[in-house]
Structures are given as structure tokens and as C-alpha cells.
Amino acid sequence: KNRFGAANELGVFEMREHGLKEIGNPSALFLSERQFGASGSAVVCALEGTRPLMVEVQALVANASYGTPQRTSTGFDTKRLQLLLAVLEKREGLRFSQNDVFLNVAGGVRLDEPAVDLAVALAVASSLKDVPLDSGTAVVGEVGLGGEIRAVSRIETRLTEIKQLGFERAMIPKANAKGLKVPAGLEILPVRRLSEALDLVC
């Protein structure tokens, strides 16, 4: 059939006894089982098509017990994870050569956009250091090979979703902060480099 418009929109449905029922607020659903105070957890506002979606990124860094360290990712590109680990090692001095690294996007969602990078990097660093991230902070940003945090698209849409889900702070690229319309009651933490982000939350 002929199709007009974007074809990459996400719909979330729940199977009930009378059939499928749309989930009106999938972000709340994906965060409903989030555990507070645990290291290796970061919340990101991603875009699926034009829809903002809040999801939890979970990381577990453990001592490698079987020789070559493993790099396993569910819901996020494994090669992108390896790239971010290399940036953390080269630019921030973190060491993963003796560690297995496991990454999971909670809720079975697959995240492909670069704006998820910062959440992945912070979740991994949090698990390595065993220091929980602030549960009231959501993050968004692309990480460059030099450790810089690059601007992302539709930042105001993301901030609105972050505020609606009850978060108090949003860590965003500094390049997105100029002239930004911020929802009332939401504190913005602009960062230019990955080192700044790590200093703020780890």
C-alpha cells in the first residue's frame, strides 16, 4: 500500500482480554519498575520518530572471570558501546580491560539515536565506580570521540517530557542551552565535555 509521512513512529500497546489497548504514557510505564539508589542506572529522553520516550539505561561492570572481557548490549548497538568505552578509557582514564561490561535498555526498547550516548557513558561509569547517579536527573547528549558533548535535536520537546515525568534536573549539551525555553521548575545542567558530566554525577 502507498504510505505517506514518517514510518518510524512508535506505538506502545498492552494485550488485554478484549484485545490490544494503547498505552497513553509509555514513559511512565518504562520507568515504573526503576530501582532508586542503585549504581549503573541512568534515565534518558530519547526520540522514537517524533515521540519523546523516557527510558532507563542499565549498566553492569564486573570483573572478567573467563579470560577475554565481554561486551554485551541489549537494546543498544554493541559497536557504539565499545566506542563509548574507548572514549571513557582514553579521555577520562577509566579502565575496562579487566572487566565485563553489560548494558541493557529496560522495557525491551531499542535505542539507536546518538542522543543516548551520554546516558550510556554515565551508567557505565556509575557501575564501575559503584556510585549511584542522582535519581532526579535525566540526561541527554551525544558523545564525540574527543570527549565533547554534542548538541541533539528537539531539545525543548525532550525537556517538556522530562519535566512531565517529575524529574527535577536535566543534563544537556551546553550547545543546546543558548536561548532555550526551559519548563518551569526544571533545573538545567549544561555540559560541554564528558569530564564535566562525570564530575557532576559521579
Predicted regions located by residue number:
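Peripheral, non-AAA+ core regions of ATP-driven protein-machinery
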Residues: 1-202
